[in-house]
């Protein structure tokens, strides 16, 4: 005979956890809002304002993610209870194992929804930008920065996020000096915000004929794309706008026209660049979006001493502000804030970052 009590206890536990989430995620309000959003999207003139329609579509996906999962959990737990009773009555082991398997699947869905509680920041649901900047160390640091770029692109792909390479500056010999990518998807900023900081690489350098160990640094800075409704006052007189020929990936169009744009905000010293479109006008618009987002993030940091300290540290791409150490010779990657380690270095460099990210979010970093 199979053990019934542990399964009943688990059903009870999952039911209770689902009820807690209903309250925490304000389920009833989300159901109501989903009905409103659906009604708005059904209006024949909704696409007269494309940006508003896109925002509503994005909101609907986020709301459905919560509402549909809660409904699935409610119905699923009821179904499992029915299967369990059927298994007991018929003394049917196959039905019992079916109930156990369904319960495990429901627990995984619930755990994913519970993890969303980590995304409680004001802009966690937003798309975001990731700036990468090579530290001192010449070619070795520039190669490391390109490895980080690949790592984040692979990670985003594994999460189903959309990525755009906004700007990349090639290294002198190999690698890149800097890059900016835009990551779009549900809770993109929430997932990536704890990646801001210095990433340290230790390895035997392929660029050293004596095969000596080298230490290199690269900085990552993650900031959210902000809503157009948020008013950021930018004085055109404070801007220096340069246009130049794009370099790097871009096919036959590269280096033929001055479509790439660089904007310097003189009072703050912030520099943003974009070269991913053939149109100079579109690149300029994208630069202004990035500048607006960075200025907004700077304002938030001024109100928060810890975040301000983090931004101050960013300027020193060296030992003091590291978040993660990648020691390839020892096959060890360690997060210096949470203590999480992974010895499968290639998997991490191929984008397997969830263990590190989840630990830092759970630690409230």
UniProtKB/Swiss-Prot annotation:
Subcellular location: Cytoplasm
PTM sites of type N5-methylglutamine: 252
Presence of the UniProt keyword Manganese in the record: no
One annotated GO biological process: viral translational frameshifting
PROSITE patterns listed in its UniProt record: RF_PROK_I
Keyword annotations: Cytoplasm, Methylation, Protein biosynthesis
Family in the record: Belongs to the prokaryotic/mitochondrial release factor family.
Pfam families referenced in this protein's UniProt entry, alphabetically: PCRF, RF-1
Note: The gene for this protein contains a UGA in-frame termination codon after Leu-25; a naturally occurring frameshift enables complete translation of RF-2. This provides a mechanism for the protein to regulate its own production.
Protein name: Peptide chain release factor 2
Gene Ontology MF terms in the entry: translation release factor activity, codon specific
Disulfide cysteine pairs (residue numbers): none
Post-translational modification: Methylated by PrmC. Methylation increases the termination efficiency of RF2.
């Amino acid at each position: 005979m199979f053990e019934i009590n542990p399964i009943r206890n688990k059903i009870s536990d999952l039911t209770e956890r689902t009820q807690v989430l209903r309250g925490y995620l304000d389920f009833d309000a989300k159901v109501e809002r989903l009905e409103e959003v659906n009604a708005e999207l059904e209006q024949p003139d909704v696409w007269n304002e494309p940006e508003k329609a896109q925002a509503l579509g994005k909101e609907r996906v986020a709301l459905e993610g919560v509402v549909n999962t809660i409904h699935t959990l409610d119905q699923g737990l009821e179904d499992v209870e029915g299967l369990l009773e059927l298994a007991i009555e018929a003394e049917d082991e196959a039905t019992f194992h079916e109930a156990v398997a369904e319960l495990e699947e429901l627990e995984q869905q619930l755990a994913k929804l519970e993890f969303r509680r980590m995304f409680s920041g004001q802009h966690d649901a937003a798309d975001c930008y990731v700036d990468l900047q090579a530290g001192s160390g010449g070619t070795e640091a520039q190669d490391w920065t390109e490895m980080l770029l690949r790592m984040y692109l692979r990670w985003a792909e594994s999460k189903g996020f959309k990525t755009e390479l906004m700007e990349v500056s090639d290294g002198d010999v190999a690698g890149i000096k800097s890059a900016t990518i835009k990551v779009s998807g549900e809770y993109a900023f929430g997932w990536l915000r704890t990646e801001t900081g210095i990433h340290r690489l230790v390895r035997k350098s392929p660029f050293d004929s004596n095969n000596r160990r080298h230490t290199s640094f690269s900085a990552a800075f993650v900031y959210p794309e902000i809503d157009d409704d948020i008013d950021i006052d930018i004085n055109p007189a404070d801007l220096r706008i340069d246009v130049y020929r794009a370099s790097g990936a871009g096919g036959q169009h590269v280096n033929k026209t001055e479509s790439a744009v660089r904007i310097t905000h003189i009072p703050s010293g912030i520099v943003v660049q974009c070269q991913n479109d053939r149109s100079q006008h579109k690149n300029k618009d994208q630069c202004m979006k990035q500048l607006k987002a960075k200025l907004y993030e700077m304002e938030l940091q001024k109100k928060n001493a810890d975040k301000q300290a983090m931004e101050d540290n960013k300027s020193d791409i060296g030992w003091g502000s590291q978040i993660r150490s990648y020691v390839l010779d020892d096959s060890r990657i360690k997060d210096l804030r949470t203590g999480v380690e992974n010895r499968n270095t290639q998997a991490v460099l191929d984008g397997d970052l969830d263990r590190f990210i989840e630990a830092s979010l759970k630690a409230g970093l």
